[in-house]
């Protein structure tokens, strides 16, 4: 790792105190003369061709945004260091930076690929292609009534239902909005896609788990209602009547660096289930 870059969310570190501390520690630990620093808000416009490892300083939202922005152009691993709120996707919290540096120096880490989604939105007026690491959400506007959704999987009709919307999630996104809507946790290394309805007007419409290479087509009957499509809860577009939405596995995944002692279930307990450090499960 001769060329390390750091992407910082400036809203999380307005005085650069954390950034300067992290840069100093990495330079000392790896005997580096220079570390390139990038603003997470415009990182898509930057040249990261020579970066061997990208450190992301921020929260889950920062990492999600960078994963989407760099998906086409960046092939090196990403190490998330949480300086935000939840930090479920990050490999380490900023309070454990010294421990993380030792593990990096000793080579006690591995790379994991997390699948992403590709979303194509097509109408007579517009065509747009989006990507998501967590989820693609189709949902009605605040004052709209229920919408009728028709879902096809691999060209075969799966379901037609009325409700507030639906969530198409990756395993990484299974702990986010999908979980809040009643979807299951999916182990993040798997390649699966889930479809979870939002407030369906029938109890028979439940989450379905699909193979990772499934192709999902969604049509929404909403001539008089407002419908919005969002990716990772960050980018939203208004869906017009007669618009088709196609969601499938993205060709490229995102490569994350995690440490050898990473315990998914411990992170799940502490940051999602209990939101505490209780029940570490050292002994049963």
From Swiss-Prot:
Q: Which reaction does it catalyse?
A: NAD(+) + ATP = ADP + NADP(+) + H(+)
Which InterPro entries does the UniProt entry name for this protein?
A: ATP-NAD_kinase_N (IPR017438), ATP-NAD_kinase_PpnK-typ_C (IPR017437), NAD/diacylglycerol_kinase_sf (IPR016064), NADK (IPR002504)
Name the cofactor(s) required for activity, per the record. Answer: a divalent metal cation
Q: What class of enzyme is it?
A: transferase
Name a GO molecular-function annotation: NAD binding
Where is the protein localized?
Cytoplasm
Residues noted as binding NAD(+) in the record, renumbered to the chain:
60-61, 134-135, 145, 162, 164, 175-180, 234
Q: Which Pfam families match?
A: NAD_kinase, NAD_kinase_C
Choose one Gene Ontology CC annotation of this protein and give it.
cytoplasm
One Gene Ontology term of the biological-process aspect is: NAD metabolic process
Alphabetical keyword list: ATP-binding, Cytoplasm, Kinase, NAD, NADP, Nucleotide-binding, Transferase
What Enzyme Commission number does this protein have?
A: 2.7.1.23
Active site, per annotation = 60 (proton acceptor)
Superkingdom to which the source organism belongs? Bacteria
- Record keywords: Nucleotide-binding included? yes
Q: Which family does it belong to?
A: Belongs to the NAD kinase family.
> Entry's PANTHER family?
NAD KINASE
So what does this one do? Involved in the regulation of the intracellular balance of NAD and NADP, and is a key enzyme in the biosynthesis of NADP. Catalyzes specifically the phosphorylation on 2'-hydroxyl of the adenosine moiety of NAD to yield NADP.
Query: What name does this protein carry?
Result: NAD kinase
Q: Which organism is it from?
A: Clostridium beijerinckii (strain ATCC 51743 / NCIMB 8052)
Report which gene this protein is encoded by. nadK
